[in-house]
Amino acid sequence: MKAGIHPAYNEISVICACGHSLKTRSTHKGDMRVEICSSCHPFFTGKQKLMDTAGRIDRFEKKYKASRVGKAAPTT
């Protein structure tokens, strides 16, 4: 690598809003603050909110049922 053209690569602390922090290396200067991390994100903590997909499918079928009425089934 050429000397003097690359940014400084330093060890920084990434600090979450929940208080969790971790060390990493980056070209970012100073500490990095984030709103969410793996310690507090619902996907990683298991407190994930599941959507009602069955209800969404029913609404979709109800909405487009009128457009299918009277049309012949596709032939193969």
From Swiss-Prot:
Cofactor: binding details: Binds 1 zinc ion per subunit.
Gene Ontology cellular-component terms listed: ribonucleoprotein complex; ribosome
Residues holding Zn(2+): C16, C18, C37, C40
InterPro entries named in the record: Ribosomal_bL28/bL31-like_sf, Ribosomal_bL31, Ribosomal_bL31_A, Ribosomal_bL31_sf
Biological-process GO terms, alphabetical: translation
A molecular function GO annotation: metal ion binding
Keywords: Metal-binding, Ribonucleoprotein, Ribosomal protein, RNA-binding, rRNA-binding, Zinc
Pfam families recorded: Ribosomal_L31 (PF01197)
Key word Ribosomal protein present: yes
Cofactor(s), names only, from the UniProt record: Zn(2+)
Keyword Zinc carried by entry: yes
Family to which this protein belongs: Belongs to the bacterial ribosomal protein bL31 family. Type A subfamily.
Binding partners and assembly: Part of the 50S ribosomal subunit.
Functional summary from the UniProt entry: Binds the 23S rRNA.
Name of the protein described by the UniProt record: Large ribosomal subunit protein bL31
